[in-house]
């Protein structure tokens, strides 16, 4: 009966505190749901925006731009005719490639200098261990783990040596002094 009287107040406390939390949750948002940004679903703009819907043009075709620049020298002679420069720029769009599990970031950068017609390509492939902060954390963790292992081995060796010396308490009881009593030296002749 005593257990029932202990359980009843706790059950009532739980019921009233649950109701209080529900009331506090309702009082948290004073405004209506529309002013808080909770609108009904609007599917009118389903295909608009970046990366949604079917694209208007095909991304698999190559875009080729042909540029012809004629540079005329001020006075053409038989030694120096005019120069006809043709520049062919090709932009190829490729399908996105999936990353390997260990690879974090892969970026391709193409730098084009228009006046010198020099194209430089830089490729950055970076996996998890090429990042300096991850590498520093792995090295620090390995060092701390190594020190912990050395400390543990030294502690075990210390305890083994102490046990061999006999000063280590193994929990064994010493025999009482009554066991080591000297035998009587009196001799009885019968």
UniProtKB/Swiss-Prot annotation:
Glycosylation sites: 36, 48, 50, 52
PTM annotation, UniProt: O-glycosylated; contains both heparan sulfate and chondroitin sulfate.
Keyword Iron: no
Membrane topology: Single-pass type I membrane protein
Protein name, per record: Syndecan-2-B
Entry's family note: Belongs to the syndecan proteoglycan family.
Transmembrane segments: 137-157
Signal peptide bounds: 1-22
Cellular location(s): Membrane
Sorted UniProt keywords: Glycoprotein, Heparan sulfate, Membrane, Proteoglycan, Signal, Transmembrane, Transmembrane helix
Extracellular-side positions: 23-136
Stretch list, region Disordered: 34-60, 167-190
Segments on the Cytoplasmic side according to the record's topology features: 158-190
Function: Cell surface proteoglycan.
A GO BP annotation: cell migration
InterPro entries: Neurexin-like (IPR003585), Syndecan (IPR001050), Syndecan/Neurexin_dom (IPR027789), Syndecan_CS (IPR030479)
GO CC aspect terms: cell surface; membrane
